[in-house]
A protein has these predicted regions:
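Nucleotide and nucleotide-moiety/phosphate-recognizing core
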Residues: 5-139, 171-178
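Short glycine- and hydrophobic/aromatic-rich loop-to-beta-strand nucleating segment
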Residues: 141-145, 184-186
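Conserved alpha/beta core of the MobA/IspD/sugar-nucleotide pyrophosphorylase nucleotidyltransferase superfamily
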Residues: 2-8, 151, 155-198
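Short beta-strand and adjoining strand-loop segment in the mid-core
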Residues: 88-90, 148-153
Length: 198
């Protein structure tokens, strides 16, 4: 990988506090190919490349596994306040750093190689927001934000996440093409069943 990556303190925030209401609750504990969804997300992280990994969750199982792996376990006691609180908590735990990769737990087909491609794009263009793009042109997760955008991320409210910051700065976004199945997020049990057939 580009040596510039080693010179930048890039942190990762794993967002794992969602209630999964459309799933019927407990979404991140659901299994896919023998692993719980949150474990699959942890396993695609090239953790040796990050200055630190912060996992934001209100679930004891997820927090305990985070600590076991040497990650920072960040408790979100009020997930009902929306994803903005998780972003803020994760951002504070990740500092000091020059960029943060925000990763979600409900994309079970996301591959480590794709995460590496996003990090490599960030190393080559450290001033840009890096976002994966599907074949249909829609942007997905994970997204890499340089420190210049931390104040805007910290100011988010309610159920608004990093996509709001991306929409405010389209000129700053550099996209990395990824296959549709890697960006597909599992909102329902039916979604998970459909992914198992791919």
């Amino acid at each position: 990988m580009d040596n510039k990556m080693d010179m930048r303190a890039v942190a990762c925030v794993l967002l794992a506090a969602g209630a999964g209401s459309r799933f019927g609750g407990g979404k991140l504990l659901a299994e896919f190919s023998g692993e719980r969804l949150f474990e699959r997300a942890m396993n695609v992280l090239p953790k040796e490349l990050f200055s630190r990994v912060a996992v934001v969750s209100g679930c004891e199982d997820i927090l305990a596994e985070s600590e076991r792996r040497g990650f920072l376990a960040v408790r979100n006691s009020a997930p009902e306040k929306g994803v903005s609180l998780s972003v803020r908590l994760g951002l504070e735990a990740a500092k000091p750093c020059s960029a943060v990769l925000f990763l979600v737990c409900d994309q079970p087909l996301l591959r480590k190689e794709s995460v590496l491609r996003i990090l490599e794009a960030g190393a080559a263009h450290p001033e840009r927001i890096i976002a994966p793009e599907g074949p249909d042109g829609r942007l997905g997760n994970p997204c890499l934000f340089p420190a210049a955008y931390f104040p805007e991320l910290a100011a988010l409210e309610g159920d608004r996440g990093g996509k709001r910051v991306i929409r405010a700065h389209p000129e700053a976004v550099l996209t990395v093409p990824l296959p549709e199945e890697e960006l597909f997020d599992t909102d329902t049990k039916e979604d998970l069943s459909r992914l198992k057939e791919i």
